[in-house]
Amino acid sequence: MKTILRSTLMMLLGAMLLAGCAKDNRIIEKPVFLASNTTSIEVSKVTLTDSTTVLDIFARYQPKYWIRIASSTYLTDDKGNDYPIQSGIGIELDKEFWMPESGEAEFKLVFPRLRNGSKYFDFSEGAEVSGGFNIWGVQLKSNELSELKLPKAMLAQEVDKEDPLEVPELKYGKATVKGQVLDYQPGMPAALKIVVYNPLVGYDGDMDVNIESDGTFEHSMDILGVANCIVYYGEMGVNTEVFVEPGKISEVFLNIREASRVRSKFHYNGESYGKVSYYNGPLEIVIREKQEIDELLRASRGEWATYDFKKKPEVLLEEYKKNEMDKANRMREAVSQSTLSQSSKDYLNGHISMQLLSGLQLAPGILTGQYSMAQRDMDREVYMAFHTKMIKALPDNYIDKSLLAILNEPVAMLDGTYGEMVRQADMIQKSHDMEEGLFTLMAKTGNLYHGIKDFMPLTDAQKEEMKSLPEACQQYLMAENDKLLAKLEANKKKSGFRVNEAGEVANEDLFASIISKFRGKVLLVDFWATW
């Protein structure tokens, strides 16, 4: 109650303060801004009095959770002058501000009067605040931003929409992702992530890439074949897809002013500042048509199917399969009727086939997940029992052989799920009579690659086995093996630890053998990769 009364009193005092000098006030309603690293707060109004700058803040956050405004918060004008925060009205600085049921709230922040003639200001909680709120380029003189200067490389090249998709080659080499964060400002996140979906393993980790002071960035990677990547500048609202290919450069420009506009409470319906990202590189036309592609898939996919879980597992599995097949056919028909380029159509037909195959592979798990959602409070034993029942009911011929043919098509490697299929190759090949082809070669390469990733260098026998693989696969494996050997040699030179050999023991006796050397002592044991 005391907190509510204090907040109410502060709001009244603030209103009196503003009303007392209203004739001299200058008010900017819903000012446009350049960029923001948050959707939790936005400036809804700026009031310039003869002595203060008051920001009305609209807050939007998860209901019953809190946000906080640090006492280190300050404004910086267009000449570089700083104005430290003086007080909050309706919010106490450095204290938790709990969001109501609606998830929306308003309060005011008071700063010194900005310099006369200021064109804009930046808002920051300060570099010392981890995850602090930052808003750049809040406009005071205009309801428009300065013109966005587009690099020449960003201008789309003319392409023939009738050209078919260039068949991805299985080759090895360095691929480069480079580009620029447009409108990059001091204080913006100084790194972004590149997430790689390797045709051999699927998700292959993400890499932090530093951003230079002018907003440019560049990263090179060893890659086998054409791979799907995500350039992720998450705090600034940019998440864009690119393709990388050995020997080629993938160039991407990130438009953070547009990314911030579409996330804005007050400006998302306003005039666009262009695309969120621009791309030049492999499969350029597919990326250029990405928005149309996403809209087409969303419209043709249809509603999420529901199931009567009182039916037998065999019936549920057949209903699920029919729904997935029907969905794929609807999407293929939509693709054929679309005005997309032939390259995008070729890419999409491969993508649809891969998504269908992946969906059928995961049928027991997906149905179990829907069953769990329908039941809501389900304990783990019931969940696992249902999942086991679905797996047992899965017939051997559930996935038609014709659907597996896509795995031997090079276009399949462009899909992010291809690497996951390669990881499951042993299971797929045991369950189905797979024809020899691209997939079996990638599966053999993948098995050797996983060993290297598990810190096991290639043996002489494996190197001999490797000779049956395409040259690109051999080059990739040898390069990864050399990296591992170099790492192992470097680790041998480290000190401060001792490696103990377990010796030749049966699997069931391994742990007992390891700890036997330390009998009577306290041990910290770290178990990992137990699956």
Task: List where the protein language model places each region.
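Low-complexity, acidic Ser/Thr/Pro/Gly-rich terminal tails and inter-domain linkers that flank the onset
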Residues: 25-50, 87-91
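Solvent-exposed beta-hairpin/edge-strand motifs
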Residues: 67-88, 128-138
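Short, solvent-exposed, Trp/other aromatic-anchored flexible loops in extracytoplasmic proteins
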Residues: 84-129
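A non-transmembrane, solvent-exposed segment enriched in polar/low-complexity residues
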Residues: 89, 137-342
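C-terminal motif of bacterial Sec signal peptides marking the signal peptidase cleavage site
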Residues: 18-20
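Conserved redox-active cysteine motifs that mediate thiol-disulfide chemistry
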Residues: 519, 523-531
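Short, well-ordered beta-strand segments enriched in hydrophobic/aromatic residues
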Residues: 52-61
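Oxidative protein folding and maturation machinery
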Residues: 167, 256-521
